[in-house]
Amino acid sequence: MRVSALAFAAVLSLVSAKKINMHCNFAEDHTGMVQQPYCCRDLVPARGNSKANEALDCDQLDQPQLCDDQSRPACCYTIGAKKICTSHVIFQDAEDV
């Protein structure tokens, strides 16, 4: 019985260690800019661009994760100090890619 429990624990750890990728599409505000994943705390609607939000207080992500407030990261491109965000990160199972 003990061997079965150890085998089950090993299988369970392999399943929970699944590799996840995150991906950002090109900007959806007709600029076609390449976007990167950010967690932004001050997103507001962009002036003159109904398909985007803008922010200054952002942290760029390099690992798949949720933001501190458990929200999905935004996909943004930069113009000067501003981040222009037009969509959200897409999380995918690495085996699907």
UniProtKB/Swiss-Prot annotation:
Keywords associated with the record: Cell wall, Disulfide bond, Secreted, Signal
Result of knocking out the encoding gene: Affects hydrophobicity only when HfbC, HfbD and HfbE are also deleted. Disruption of all 7 hydrophobins leads to altered germination kinetics, decreased survival under exposure to extreme cold stress and increased mycotoxins patulin and citrinin production.
Cystine residue pairs: 24-75, 39-67, 40-58, 76-85
Top-level taxon of origin: Eukaryota
Signal peptide start and end residues: 1-17
Keyword Transcription part of the UniProt annotation: no
Main location (coarse class): secreted
Compartments (UniProt record): Secreted; Secreted, Cell wall
Presence of the UniProt keyword Chaperone in the record: no
UniProt function note: Aerial growth, conidiation, and dispersal of filamentous fungi in the environment rely upon a capability of their secreting small amphipathic proteins called hydrophobins (HPBs) with low sequence identity. Class I can self-assemble into an outermost layer of rodlet bundles on aerial cell surfaces, conferring cellular hydrophobicity that supports fungal growth, development and dispersal; whereas Class II form highly ordered films at water-air interfaces through intermolecular interactions but contribute nothing to the rodlet structure.
Protein name: Unclassified hydrophobin F
Upper classification of the organism: Eukaryota, Fungi, Dikarya, Ascomycota, Pezizomycotina
